[in-house]
């Protein structure tokens, strides 16, 4: 992928070196916009929660869905805030549990990379399947405490929805440079 500001330079270098090239997508932003149309009309008609798996959703829709599940399935679902992002957004966790104190834990997170929208969608789909079929699940599923964090990087996720679709990192400010953001799963001390 080549930024339009550098396109002529790249073309010249390719031609100088007798390299063939083909433009696959003329306007990547247009292709991105067409791939994820605004789902507002689809959502306005819905009763209950606003989440579908026909579109990618913003952070508010995902958090509203978690809160909805806590109301609909109060015996198994609990929502809590486990922290906040650098911009002050809550990081929400959904626990699905039969409340057996002997249960082992299963932790599932998504949305660590802002632009990978399929990750929160996959996590919320798993949540949907687990909650809607919980009574029929096998004991090895029900005898776990499930902990889901659908969006571990809420600032980056919202930024990728509203400003820069290809943004990957969080939105942390760097004190010694103008570089914004940290790639969260590459910033561990080990």
Q: Where are these predicted regions, by residue range?
A:
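M14 metallocarboxypeptidase catalytic domain recognition
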Residues: 1-190
């Amino acid at each position: 992928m080549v930024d339009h500001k550098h396109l002529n330079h790249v073309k010249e270098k390719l031609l100088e070196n007798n390299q063939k090239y083909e433009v696959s997508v003329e306007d990547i932003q247009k292709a991105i916009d067409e791939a994820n149309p605004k789902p507002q009309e689809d959502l306005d008609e819905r009763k209950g929660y606003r989440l579908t798996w026909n579109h990618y959703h913003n952070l508010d829709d995902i958090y509203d869905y978690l809160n909805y599940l806590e109301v609909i399935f109060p015996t198994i679902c609990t929502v809590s805030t486990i922290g906040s992002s650098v911009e002050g957004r809550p990081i929400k966790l959904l626990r699905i549990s039969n409340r057996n104190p002997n249960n082992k834990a299963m932790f599932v997170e998504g949305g660590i990379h802002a632009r990978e929208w399929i990750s929160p969608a996959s996590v919320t789909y798993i949540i949907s399947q687990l909650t809607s079929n919980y009574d029929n699940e096998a004991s090895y599923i029900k005898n776990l405490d499930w902990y889901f964090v659908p969006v571990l990087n809420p600032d980056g996720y919202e930024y990728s929805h509203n400003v820069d679709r290809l943004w990957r990192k969080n939105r942390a400010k760097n004190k010694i440079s103008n570089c914004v953001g940290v790639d969260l799963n590459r910033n561990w001390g080990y």
